[in-house]
Amino acid sequence: MAANFSDIADSAYTRAGELRTRALELAEIELHAFVPVLEALRLPRDDPERAARVSAAKTEASQSPLEIARVAAEVAELAAELARTGNPNLTGDAIAGALLAEAAAQAASRLVAINLADGPVVEEAAALALRADAARDRALGN
């Protein structure tokens, strides 16, 4: 909504639409991403391939929340820009967008950390959550 009335409306509106489309795609992917993990966990505990299959499934299942964190960070940054430069009557909408995007980035980052415990993907997800956090602060004027 805030993108419809700002000086940067055309590019912001277009990018927001692209991000919305990607977020919806990722939500659909995320619905099914954990199924292979559950299947691997159902293998007998003494199966020699169980640990490797669980690990591989968790790594793969972490890709969609990582991408969700990436999209959410960009949404938060776009919302922060709109909060600062957009139509003053819609600043609240932009701030709400930044807050929601930051929450999505944090949640997605936590899912990655839960699945993988540590490593470069966890660090990347945490960095994306921090980007969203900084954007939220900018949107709030902090």
Model-derived segments and spans:
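C-terminal auxiliary extensions adjacent to catalytic cores
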Residues: 108-142
